[in-house]
């Protein structure tokens, strides 16, 4: 298939769904990791094409959703300083911190600017030498190379007024954490294709070896996801556990080597806290010592914060595939995209937002 329309072809999608029905002889619980995949499933009703025995649960692959509450609070604290320009991706502005969000901080007079590329933050620093420019650098492996390039560029130019508040997370350690959890029900994973375009597929081999669980790297269109489900069902029904790549048009086994090189130049692997989940060993990236001059935590001596999620929010269970958004008593009533209790309701990749926009069964409106 060469053209996008083919990956949305109803005839092909229904044929794949039919084969899934024919091959499924027992119940299976499958998890799509990426929030973009979740939105495709909800938008096109793909789960409703599957047999009752196939349950799709949603994973922690929404970068905005897993950015720690403490990081949001730190960003707000920095933004409210009169000498600081806080630069962020737009998705982060309405993510609730413990008391406020960046959009409210902006309304209070904070200089918060939206960027579509990390290099825009470097440009802002270059153009405002009398201000301290902090870039909120979040995301999975997908955005890490571009964020690393921003730090590399700032160092090359000798910019002394640029820094980054980093909250980068890695997918394979998150899958490992899910697998060792006593509450885990997942029997097969659809790995996020966009992440794998950067890092390739090789990092998933250890998971298959250690847990004997099938993993299929999948794309983001309806046909991609149904084909990935079919590939998982084939493996599970045959008692196999191997790594397969459905997203061959974009993902290679080795990934993007130059992107990996700039990541390795700027970042190193570290333990990382995930919002609603807790700390996962070796699941994040932090700036290397050679780039510590661009670490906002050090520059502003931010220290460590400890804050709790709203008691009513079940986003932690949603991000681990333990509950669906509609299981939340606040869903669609006390928690909406306009007034979110948790990040999954406000992010464009959040599972709660996907359910709110495409499927609000049983919710009073």
Q: How does the language model describe each region?
A:
Residues 1-130, 144, 148, 152-157, ...:
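Metallocofactor- and cofactor-centric catalytic cores in central/energy metabolism, strongly enriched
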Residues 27-30, 161-162, 238-248, 274, ...:
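Flexible, glycine/charged-enriched surface loops at secondary-structure junctions
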Residues 85, 132-134, 188:
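Structural motif
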Residues 115, 136, 218-219:
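Active-site-adjacent beta-strand anchor residues
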Residues 127-131, 153-160, 181-184, 213, ...:
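Secondary-structure boundary elements
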Residues 136, 140-203:
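Phosphate/pyrophosphate-binding betaalpha-module
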Residues 165, 183-252:
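A conserved active-site cap/scaffold subdomain adjacent to cofactor or substrate pockets
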